[in-house]
Amino acid sequence: MNKKSKFKFTAKLGLILSIVFTLLCAISANLLLSNFGKVKIETTTVQTRSGDNVSIRVYSPKVATSENKAPAVVLAHGLSTTKECYAQYALELSRRGFVVVTPDMLNHGGSDITPFETFFTDINADAYGIYAAVNYVSKLDYVDLDQIGIVGHSMGGNATNMSVNLDNMSGNPVISAVYLIASNPTFKDFEGNWANVYGNRNVGLYYTYYDHVYFSTQTEDGQPVSAQQFLDSNEAKSFVSFGQDPSTLTDVEVIPGHTYTAEINGKQVIRRITKADEIHPKPQGGNGSVAAVVDFFQESFVAPNYEVGAMQIWNFYSLASILGLFGALSICVFTIATLTKTKFFSSLKAEANKQLKPAPNKTGKICFWVLTIANCAFAFLSISFIFEKGYGYFTTEFLPQQTTNIYALWSLANGVFMLITSFGSYYLYARKQGDTLKSWGVLISIKDFLKSLLLALIGVLSVISVLYIAQYVFQIDLRFYLWGMREMPLDHLYLFFTYLPFFLVFGIAVSISINSAYYSKIGKEPTFINDLFFALMNMIPAFAITFIGYYLFAKTGFQPDIFGAPFTFTYMINAIPVFPVAVLLLRRLAKYCNNPYIPGIIVGSLLCFMQVASVFTCHTFMFMG
């Protein structure tokens, strides 16, 4: 009688399945982004008048030809994001027949990193490179020159307004419609007089009610007016009145969603404000703003394939994209699992069926809870200190990324503190129970440490390779909303190595903490509950600061000066899911390794790469508070 063979899930099988899964996700995302092959997507560069290169992505419906010209839209991203972060707008517009161009601003993403003077003051920088993309579009023979629009979110709105000014000065303006997302319109001319700087262009505004950056104004006596009162402001009244001086207006009511019309230079022109009960970054991943943008340009131009803006498929693209990222992380885990079974890396292999240690005794539990709460409390205190002292707002020649400086300093501070608490628990409790630094995996031979470095490097490269393939083969990054990973231009890689030490300290420290010091049950919980507990504990500081900050902001209309500074809470939203995912990845990697360095180096490196690849870079000493 033949015995039935049991199916055995191996590391090699896991690696193969992870590769196949990630590939399927990338293919699915690309198919959705290209409207199943009906839209040609290509990435190229254009030059500003200052001679700097701007990376742009061009979405061209294949039905657009020199005989069948299509309307076009240029989309400007916000500060410290990239063109990939707004792919949903390009997807929805291009599948409706619009040519769409999404540039990386100068000093962002794949574009050149320019000096301070070029980025901020040089008119030849072409509005951070955005107007260079407009000029590029105007030269495409399959674009209708009478139907070119521009849209920008946040700082991209600033770039949009600057592009309009440049267009006005060009002598041959090509922009005929403008949309601003969570960004102020231009209300006055260069002399400070109320004016219609947009001329006979259609202009729409997506007004985010809980916006902490834009829409706040002042009364005539200089008193601040919150963004939540924007619709009652003189600025809003002037906008819907096509630049008229508010003092000359009587009984003007700004009604969100209402279309205001006027005839300017023989053309019927519209102004519209769409009110959204959203926070400032929501349009980076929200359906409402996408619908508003699509409907606005379909109304302003002749839409080749009209479909109401609320009909959207980009969420499926976003799902495929983020699943692709999890697939890439799975490739990393199973790469490590597979290689530790080889002869060369066998000395780094974890013991068979590695399990969490039993729960500690009463003394151990007291030690665990005190130190765990201390780690959590220190995260609150350290980020407050960083912002209170102004360290959250600076750049230097050597540390040129303001946003990264926040997370780098926070990672370093928390990493050092976790090392103190982890080794504190060792000397106070663990060694009295028979633990040693060798049993923790902290004390290893130099040979094994060097092998660990090599294995960790392979793990990091397995993920980064996926990012480059995703970018250059499938024209996507791997993300959901604010959170994701993309490749870096090779000439920008020095930024990764500049910030790597900060994140390595954090990654290794957290790994020692949860994979050595606290690699045990708390009670009788299953392993996955234990993993989720540590993931939750690492998420609490960022989540609490974000929630409290936005709650108070929603109540008062003004940024609360808590946790060190008024803007602290606005930066913490980016960290909310990142830390728990990092913890879960550390735990998964630890199942196959006998020391905490391999998971720590991998996670620290990936956190660093994720952070530095997308944000604003400027090599100068500057305070951005």
Enumerate the language-model features and the residues they cover:
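Short, Lys/Arg-rich N-terminal segment immediately upstream of the first membrane anchor
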Residues: 1-11, 355-363
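An N-terminal hydrophobic leader/cap segment in hydrolases
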Residues: 6-47, 55-57
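Juxtamembrane interface at the cytosolic side of transmembrane helices
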Residues: 326-373
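Alpha-helical transmembrane segments of integral membrane proteins
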Residues: 2, 369-625
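Juxtamembrane/start-of-transmembrane alpha-helix segments at the extracytoplasmic/lumenal side
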Residues: 311-325
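Hydrophobic H-region at the start of alpha-helical membrane spans
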Residues: 11-21, 324-328, 371-374, 413-417
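Structural signature of transmembrane alpha-helix termini at the membrane-water interface
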Residues: 27-31, 333-343, 469, 548, ...
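Soluble extramembrane regions of membrane proteins in the secretory/endomembrane system
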Residues: 38-313
